[in-house]
Every structure is written in C-alpha cells, then in structure tokens.
Amino acid sequence: MACEKPVKVRDPTTGKEVELVPIKVWQLAPRGRKGVKIGLFKSPETGKYFRAKVPDDYPICS
C-alpha cells in the first residue's frame, strides 16, 4: 500500500517547513509501550532522504 496523504514536516537540510508525501511509514516503539510513527521523506530541493515523525492516525505503508 502506497502512502498518499501529504504531511507537513520540517526539512532538516534546508530548514524549511514543507508538505510532502512520505515514501514509507513505520511504527517505532520500545517493547510493551506506545511508540511513534516515523516517515521517510525525500527533500525536494537537495534530494537527500530524511526521517520525521508523522501523526499517530497516519496509516503504516511501504
């Protein structure tokens, strides 16, 4: 299942706030505790990949 909903994140390479669709989203959690969802994004300006937190209601996709 592909990710389709754009998320507002801060691009660490440029420092700008951008709205991007994540390439992949996964759950990152310690054993037995509620974790966070992390998304993999590609910077539109530099082409570098970075990870950022996505909202908890965002579906896990690859």
UniProtKB/Swiss-Prot annotation:
Keyword Zinc on entry: no
Keywords: Chromosome, Cytoplasm, DNA-binding, Methylation
InterPro entries: Cren7_sf, dsDNA-bd_Cren7
Chief localisation class: cytoplasm
Protein biosynthesis among keywords: no
Single GO MF annotation: double-stranded DNA binding
GO cellular component annotations of the record: chromosome; cytoplasm
Modification comment: Methylated at multiple sites, to varying extents.
Subcellular location: Chromosome; Cytoplasm
Pfam families recorded: Cren7 (PF11520)
HAMAP family linked: Chromatin_Cren7
Family: Belongs to the Cren7 family.
Oligomeric form and interacting partners: Monomer.
Function: A chromatin protein, binds double-stranded DNA without sequence specificity. Constrains negative DNA supercoils.
Name the record gives this protein: Chromatin protein Cren7 2
Native species: Hyperthermus butylicus (strain DSM 5456 / JCM 9403 / PLM1-5)
